[in-house]
Amino acid sequence: MNLISIPALQDNYIWLLSNKENRCVIVDPGEASPVLDALAQHALFPEAILLTHHHNDHVGGVHELLKHYPNLPVFGPKETAKCGATSLLEEGNTVSLLNSEFSVIEVPGHTSGHIAYYNAPFLFCGDTLFSAGCGRIFEGTPRQMYESIQKIAVLPDDTVICCAHEYTLSNLRFSNAIWPEDQSIEAYLHEISQIREKSQSSLPTTLGLERRINLFLRCHELDLKRKLSKEPENIENWQVFEMLRSKKDCF
C-alpha cells in the first residue's frame, strides 16, 4: 500500500491510500480540486471515499468528486448521510476495498458519531488523535473522548496515525509548557520546529512515537497527574485527560 497526504484548506490533510493496481481510497476530502490533481498526478483511480465525521472541512469536496466519479461509493458514520455518504457504518463493521479490509472503530467525542478506519498498519482517525494532541470536544464528553483514544492506544506501536490536521507544532508547544522537563517532548519540539520552518509535513506519525510525546496518551502517569492535581493519587485517568483538554482549549 502507498500513502499520500494532500494538503488542503488552511491546515487539513486529505489522505489517499493506493494499492499496486493504482486503485485508491480517498479519506476525508474537505475539498475536491487538490484530490483531482493528486489522482491525475499519480494516475490513480478512486475506489471509494471514506468519511470519519460530518464537519465540512472533511466532507466539503464529496459532491464535486461525485460529479467526476458518479458511481463512487461513499462510506461514513450515520451523521454523514447528509454529506453524501451512501453506506453508513458503525463499530465492528468492515469495509472491503483495495483487496483489503478496513475495520471501523467508533471514536465519539469530537463529534457524537465520529469513526476511524483501521487497515494495519494505517489508522485514519480524523480529528480524534493528533500528533502530540487530540481533537476538541464539540459533541461528546471528555470521558467519551478519553475512552475513544484508549481504543486507539491498544493498537501496535507501528500503527501509522493518519490524522487530519497539521497541529503538531502547536500541540508540542502546549505539552512543553505543561511538562518542560520532559526530554522526549523537548527534543521532538525542536525537530518539528525545524521541519515546519521548511514548510514540510509532520505527518503521518506512529503510535509508538505518540506514546512518548503525546500527553493525552499518558494520562495514567503519576508524574503528569502531579503536574495537574494536588491529589494525584486520587484522580482518575479520564479526569487528567479532561484537565489537559481544558487547558489546551485556552492555550
Curated annotation (Swiss-Prot):
Gene3D superfamilies: Ribonuclease Z/Hydroxyacylglutathione hydrolase-like. GO terms for biological process: methylglyoxal catabolic process to D-lactate via S-lactoyl-glutathione. Its cofactor is Zn(2+). It catalyses: an S-(2-hydroxyacyl)glutathione + H2O = a 2-hydroxy carboxylate + glutathione + H(+). Transmembrane segments: none annotated. Thiolesterase that catalyzes the hydrolysis of S-D-lactoyl-glutathione to form glutathione and D-lactic acid. Binds 2 Zn(2+) ions per subunit. Monomer. Zn(2+) 1 binds at H53, H55, H110, D127. The gene is gloB. Pathway: Secondary metabolite metabolism; methylglyoxal degradation; (R)-lactate from methylglyoxal: step 2/2. This is Hydroxyacylglutathione hydrolase. Belongs to the metallo-beta-lactamase superfamily. Glyoxalase II family. Zn(2+) 2 binds at D57, H58, D127, H165. The keyword Hydrolase applies. NCBIfam families: GSH_gloB.
